[in-house]
Regions:
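A short beta-to-alpha transition loop/helix N-cap that caps and shapes the active-site region
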Residues: 28, 55, 128-134, 149-153
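C-terminal catalytic histidine-bearing segment of alpha/beta-hydrolase fold enzymes
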Residues: 139-143, 168, 178-246
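Short alpha-helix in the alpha/beta-hydrolase fold that links the catalytic acid
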Residues: 33-34, 152-179, 189-199
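Serine-hydrolase catalytic machinery in alpha/beta-hydrolase-like enzymes
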Residues: 1-7, 13-96, 105-109, 113, ...
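Primarily recognizes the serine-hydrolase "nucleophile elbow" in alpha/beta-hydrolase
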Residues: 93-139
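Acidic glycine-/aspartate-rich tracts in secreted/extracellular proteins
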Residues: 8-9, 24-26, 51-54, 147-149, ...
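Active-site nucleophile loop of the alpha/beta-hydrolase fold
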Residues: 51, 122-129, 145-149
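Conserved strand-to-loop "acid loop" that flanks and positions the catalytic carboxylate
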Residues: 143-148, 154-155, 161-162, 212-216
Length: 246
């Protein structure tokens, strides 16, 4: 599923590319409905790929794609290259990957295994299940909700498991990516309604932002009352992201 600008565009437009990955058991059309990205991105090309048997092989565990050894890293790389060939107006230095749940896990893997492809990622309600030892600098947004029944939030919280895989806590995932991205303390803390945002400055001018919502569940946060939409957190964050270092 590709959503492109309706008006004619040229190479001079230098549009961003957003690759948006659905969760396990979902699909591209459902992911488009789940988010409001297409309505709020402005001029951009959005791509909603379809995972194998509605899942992604993010490494570590879970789903048909993992069980059958599907090479989703190569698949997403081919998707990006195909879009760049078909839409010359897309700026290859402004490609980003967003994902929810299993799709969020996959964005972590893409950051590790496709260095230089994406300028930034956003993982919503997801922790990494891949052992990433080295990372080319890129912007990273991690979004979680305190009452997510499938994720443990604080470092000392009882860890959750899925399909026999014991997952890291969200805080330990944040700490891991702070190390990988070379982020320096202290964090800058800000608040947007029910969300607390902590932002670190990292290597090569990149940033890591951890957004934690009070309440919530295992879902893509939508705007309601004082709760900001996840889309409104992610897009301002990634728009100024530099391309990963070579």
């Amino acid at each position: 599923l590709v959503v492109a600008p309706l008006r004619p565009v040229t190479r001079a437009d230098q549009l961003p590319l957003y690759v948006v990955l659905h969760g396990r058991g979902s699909n591209p059309a459902a992911m488009e409905r789940l988010t409001s990205l297409a309505a709020v991105t402005g001029p951009a090309v959005l791509v909603y790929p379809a995972g194998y048997e509605d899942s992604w092989n993010a490494g570590g565990c879970c789903g048909y794609a993992h069980a059958d050894g599907i090479n989703d890293v190569a698949f997403i790389h081919a998707v990006v290259q195909g879009v760049l060939a078909e839409y010359p107006a897309v700026d290859p230095q402004r490609a980003f990957a967003f994902g929810f749940s299993n799709g969020g896990r996959m964005t972590y893997r893409l950051a590790c295994d496709l260095p230089g492809t994406f300028a930034g990622i956003a993982a919503v309600e997801a922790v990494p299940v891949v052992d990433c030892r080295r990372l080319h600098p890129l912007d990273v947004e991690i979004i979680a909700q305190r009452r997510d029944p499938l994720l443990a939030i604080a470092s000392g919280a009882p860890r959750k498991s899925m399909d026999g895989y014991v997952e890291p806590t969200v805080q330990s995932a944040v700490d891991q990516w702070r190390r990988l991205d070379g982020c320096a303390p202290p964090a800058t803390t800000s608040h947007r309604g029910t969300a607390t945002l902590r932002t670190w400055r990292c290597r090569a001018g990149t940033r890591l932002q951890y957004t934690l919502y009070s309440g919530g569940g295992h879902l893509w946060p939508h705007a309601h009352g004082t709760r900001p939409a996840a889309d409104g957190i992610i897009l301002p964050f990634v728009r100024s992201a530099p391309r990963p270092a070579d």
